[in-house]
From Swiss-Prot:
Keywords: ATP-binding, DNA damage, DNA repair, DNA-binding, Nucleotide-binding. It comes from the Bacteria. Pfam families: MutS_I, MutS_II, MutS_III, MutS_IV, MutS_V. The lineage of its organism: Bacteria, Pseudomonadati, Pseudomonadota, Betaproteobacteria, Burkholderiales. This is DNA mismatch repair protein MutS. SUPFAM superfamilies: DNA repair protein MutS, domain I, DNA repair protein MutS, domain II, DNA repair protein MutS, domain III, P-loop containing nucleoside triphosphate hydrolases. It comes from Paracidovorax citrulli (strain AAC00-1). The keyword DNA-binding applies. GO terms for biological process: mismatch repair. Residues 1-23 are annotated as: Disordered. GO terms for molecular function: ATP binding; ATP-dependent DNA damage sensor activity; damaged DNA binding; mismatched DNA binding.
Length: 890
């Protein structure tokens, strides 16, 4: 593609470049207007509407040309500089916006709002909206199954953080507070599309955010905002204004000053991008760490909940679960999956609702009929948000009207006994006035945009009907006029016609020009014809064109009136959207449970994970798809007496699959889904921690072993007796002795101190001795058997430790050359013989001498009592002198 003029080596200075004065008087009037608008959006690409194109200038043009592969050119001069520009057609705006947003860019849309020629100078323009990755509302830019989430992070004193986030299309502000160390877990949970934070954060906090970005936890654009926007008092006032309340007590959000500060910046930024108040934001939800089951970033990654280890959307647990008929249902189902609650109330309610949809208590079940009814339902949630923001398109209103009618039918046809389903049924009833307004106001097949006309239904407005009548009778008038003029002039091929450039005219070929009457006035000369206008035709033209313009203006005004009337229905429409989404998600859970043969879990008050015939849901589905055989189910029994399994066995035997399936079954049960097992009984769970796999983090200069130890340390600090911990091959990233020693220490700590439910897979057979020395640990292994020179993996979890590893057999299956295998067999025999002749084995699990336990030095004790963010300069200096005195010998 032609890239236009190459300006890379001879760039003209941008008028907005640093150091250039803000005086634009030397520029042309058009460029003065552009530069004044651009000054308000220095870090944003400004799409400046000029006729049928959106133009970009100078640095914006160069950047857009590079990112979008569009032509970069120069046209004319302004203030003595060539005007560097690039443009895109207005009708292709959404396509280019989508590409830029996916690249993490933000775009300000500048439209012509004044009438051309109405005033001296350039037509009036203004920025009508700013499109950023975290504030998307356009259905063309948003994926059906994902939210565009904006997150504001406020760094507070004493290593605390305030978090506030929202999806503009949902209209709910979420609040949370956490420590600096917990920010990564919260970001992984929220999955933001854009993060804003204060320009006044400390260097260390900035480095932490960048580290999260480089590590893949934070994979979205970061935007700095002025420090003054993060004001707690301002945030509290803004929240009260949105809620129309005098107190935040009803939402349990009154004592969250740090989160209030984040919400101040969040709401200001969101309003700035939409160009108006967010009137549809009607709720605040406070999220607390102790309410949710913790799923750290490593857990989400290793369990492949929504993304595979290769970064693909499927096959994952969510891709297997999601058979929803609507985008709303898919998004809600993902939220249930990624935000399971420790309290079982919601999970029990979903299981009970699913049971009725399945027909477990008698009857045929209603899930199939409901899924058929939900097919083709529009995205009410996003349409409602666009109504509130006055951005909704006519065809979206038609789709909304049809969906509301369908929702009424669903509610009328089903009478559920389950409380959750009964509540959903009640919310499906939208106000009758809303449906009547939509049906009466909008044509069944309207134009795509209001500016094109053809949107308001006939009979809705008498004045519009009259104006349309004038336009609709144009053809009759023109035909009658043509007939009369032919008779009057005796010109047989005379034609009365219309085009957008010249309006109405009478066309006469050159051979009949001698018959032209005196009242014909020449309008245009063609090669073989002349075009004329008469006083009568001119009068009709004025009337018809005036009617067309007035009708279009009337339609625009009426459309705005319809939006005004719809505002009162936004809360009810929001409830209807939530009800449709919940019903869709529950039907998907019902369908999956029946299709895949899953069972309903049971919840217990005492600590336990009891699974009979458990299967890995994704692996089982893949085996079924590829006809690769049946999945081998396994049992798991962890309780107060058995808290740890030491898992040994060959590679490819299924250790990792078994561990993951236990975690996935626990997660599915906790979200309120049936589970892939014959029976499941689950006690309280507060977190799922995993350390699986090995890979260098080159971006952060961390080796495989460093990554391994970092994740292990995080688990050892965070896990509790109610946590599920998966440890796979810990210690393999270093030498054998170091790895074995560390693995034994970690296993002992998890057993003796943490007391978490632990699945500990290892190739260190020495670790199997732990079960003999520790009452709450047991040995299990994945079965394998030899058949001649071959090995058969049974994929069964069997009691006791493995007898051998079969590593050389696995190497042969992988295609390692025969000479290498022969050498390995010889070396293995020699090593085993030497081991048998060696000294008595070291006791890995003997407690270390008390004297070896490091104490806390006076300097360390003093450091623990210092909170840098809360110190004044004088206090910091005093603390430094105190540390120096403590560090001096003697």
């Amino acid at each position: 593609m032609d890239k236009g003029i190459n300006l890379q080596n001879d760039k003209e200075p941008s008028p907005m470049a640093e150091g250039n004065p803000a005086d634009f008087s030397a520029h042309t009037p058009m460029m003065q207007q552009y530069l004044a608008l651009k000054a308000g959006y220095p870090d944003t690409l400004v799409f400046y509407r000029m006729g049928d194109f959106y133009e970009l200038f100078w640095a914006d043009a160069e950047k857009a040309a590079r990112l979008l592969d569009i032509t970069l050119t120069q046209r004319g001069q302004s203030a003595g500089q060539p005007v560097v520009m690039a443009g895109v057609p207005f009708h292709a705006l959404e396509n280019y916006l989508g590409r830029l947003i996916r690249m993490g860019e933000s775009v300000a849309i500048c439209e012509q709002v004044g009438e051309v020629g109405a005033a001296k100078g350039p037509v009036e323009r203004k920025v009508v909206r700013v499109v950023t990755p975290g504030t998307l509302t356009d259905s063309e830019l948003l994926p059906d199954k994902a939210e565009s989430m904006l997150l504001a992070v406020h760094q507070a004193p004493r290593a605390r953080c305030g978090l506030a986030w929202l999806s503009v299309t949902q209209g709910v502000v979420h609040l949370a507070e956490c420590t600096h160390d917990e920010v990564g877990t919260w970001i992984a949970r929220i999955g933001p599309s854009e993060v804003i934070y204060s320009a006044g954060v400390t260097e260390r906090f900035e480095q932490q955010l960048q580290a999260l970005r480089q590590g893949g936890v934070l994979s979205c654009p970061l935007s700095l905002r002025p420090d003054w926007q993060f004001d707690g008092a301002l945030g509290a006032r803004k929240l009260l204004e949105q809620l129309g309340a005098a107190s935040l007590n009803a939402w349990d959000a009154q004592d969250l000053a740090h989160a209030h500060a984040a919400s101040a910046a969040l709401l200001s930024y969101a309003e700035h991008t939409q160009g108006r108040a967010l009137t549809h934001i009607h709720a605040v939800r406070v999220q607390k760490n102790d309410e949710l089951i913790a799923l750290p970033p490593a857990t989400r990654r290793n369990l492949e909940l929504t993304r595979t280890l290769r970064g693909e959307d499927a096959p994952t647990l969510f891709s297997l679960l999601d058979t929803c008929m609507t985008g709303m249902g898919s998004r809600l189902l993902k939220t249930w999956l990624l935000e399971p609650r420790r309290d079982r109330t919601e999970a029990r309610a979903r299981l009970a609702a699913t049971a009725e949809l399945r027909g477990d208590h008698g009857g045929t079940g209603s899930w199939q009929a409901l899924r058929a009814a939900l097919r083709g339902v529009s995205d009410v949630e996003r349409i409602t948000a666009r109504i509130a923001l006055r951005q909704v398109r006519p065809r979206e209103l038609v789709a909304l009207c049809k969906t509301l009618h369908k929702a009424e039918q669903i509610a009328a046809e089903h009478r559920w006994q389950d409380p959750l389903l009964a509540g959903i049924s009640g919310d499906l009833h939208a106000p009758p006035a809303c449906g009547a307004l939509l049906a009466g106001a909008i044509l069944e097949e309207p134009s795509a945009l209001v500016r094109d006309g053809g949107v308001i239904a006939d009979g809705f407005d008498a004045e519009l009907d009259e104006l349309r009548g004038i336009q609709n009778h144009c053809d009759d008038f023109l035909l009658a006029l043509e007939t009369r003029e032919k008779a009057r002039t005796l010109i047989p091929n005379l034609r009365v016609q219309f085009n957008k450039v010249h309006g109405f005219y009478i066309e006469v070929t050159s051979s009949y020009l001698d018959r032209i009457p005196d009242d014909y006035r020449r309008r245009q000369t063609l090669k073989n014809a002349e075009r004329f206008i008469t006083p009568e035709l001119k009068a009709f033209e004025d009337k018809a064109l005036s009617a067309q313009e007035r009708a279009l203006a009337r339609e625009k005004w009426l459309y705005e009136q319809v939006l005004d009337q719809l505002q009162q229905h936004v809360p009810a429409l929001t409830r209807a959207a939530q009800a449709i989404a919940a019903l869709d998600a529950l039907c998907a859970l019902a369908e999956r449970s029946l299709t895949l043969g899953w069972c309903a879990p049971q919840f217990a008050a005492e600590p336990c994970i009891e699974i009979e015939g458990g299967r890995h849901p994704v692996v089982e589905a893949r085996l079924a798809e590829t006809s690769a055989g049946a999945f081998i189910p396994n049992h798991t029994r962890l309780n107060a007496n058995t808290r740890m399994q030491i898992i040994t066995g060959p590679n490819m035997g299924g250790k990792s699959t078994y561990m993951r399936q236990v975690a996935l079954i626990v997660l599915l049960a906790s979200m309120g889904s049936h589970v892939p097992a014959a029976h499941c009984r689950l006690g309280p769970i507060d977190a799922i921690h995993t350390r699986i796999g090995a890979a260098d983090d080159l971006a952060n200069a961390q080796s495989t072993f460093m990554m391994e130890m970092t994740e292990a340390a995080q688990i050892l600090h965070a896990a509790t007796p109610h946590s599920l911990v998966l440890m796979d091959e810990i210690g393999r990233g270093t030498s054998t002795f170091d790895g074995l020693a560390l693995a034994s220490g970690i296993a002992t700590h998890l057993h003796d101190r943490t007391r978490a439910f632990t699945l500990f897979a290892t190739h260190y057979f020495e670790l199997t001795e732990l079960a003999a020395r520790h009452a709450h640990a047991v040995n299990v292994h994945v079965g394998a058997t030899e058949s001649g020179s071959d090995i058969v993996f049974l994929h069964e979890i069997q009691p006791g430790p493995a007898s051998r590893s079969y590593g050389i057999h696995v190497a042969r299956l992988a295609g390692v050359p025969a000479p290498v295998l022969n050498h390995a067999r010889h070396a293995l025999s020699a090593l085993e013989e030497r081991a048998n002749e060696g000294e008595t084995q070291v006791d890995l699990f003997a407690p270390p001498p008390e004297s070896e336990a490091p104490g806390i030095s006076p300097v360390e004790a003093a450091l623990q009592g210092i909170h840098p963010d809360s110190l004044s300069p004088r206090e910091a200096l005093d603390a430094l002198y105190q540390l120096k005195r403590l560090a001096q010998p003697g």
